[in-house]
Each structure stands twice: as structure tokens, then as C-alpha cells.
Regions:
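N-terminal acidic leader/helix
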Residues: 1-22
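Short, charge-rich amphipathic interface segments used for partner binding and complex assembly
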Residues: 24-56
Length: 56
């Protein structure tokens, strides 16, 4: 599976698990990347950071 396909599948799983629109997930990921706020204190973002770091 390509990296783009993996990212798409992951965004889909996150949107279903947390009942968030997939475009909202992408927008929030973009906001997180541009922000200095520590989102790792929120469970949703801990999961995102774990996946991005290869821990999940």
C-alpha cells in the first residue's frame, strides 16, 4: 500500500472512530502542524502523534 493510501486509510479510521468529518481531520492535522500548541495532551492527538512516529 502506498504512503498516500495508508494516510487516506488512517484519516478514514480516525474520522469514524472520533466521529469527525475526514476533511476536518485533515484541517486539524494541518492546524497542528502550523501551531505551537501542545496537542499531545488530547487523546485524539496522542494517537495521531503515535502513528506519525511509528509507535502505533
Amino acid at each position: 500500500m502506498s504512503q498516500a493510501a495508508q494516510a487516506g486509510a488512517y484519516i478514514s479510521r480516525l474520522s469514524e472512530k472520533h466521529d469527525v468529518d475526514p476533511f476536518g481531520v485533515v484541517a486539524l492535522l494541518s492546524l497542528t502542524a502550523l501551531s505551537e500548541v501542545d496537542f499531545t495532551k488530547v487523546a485524539f492527538w496522542r494517537e495521531v502523534s503515535d502513528v506519525m512516529a511509528g509507535r502505533a
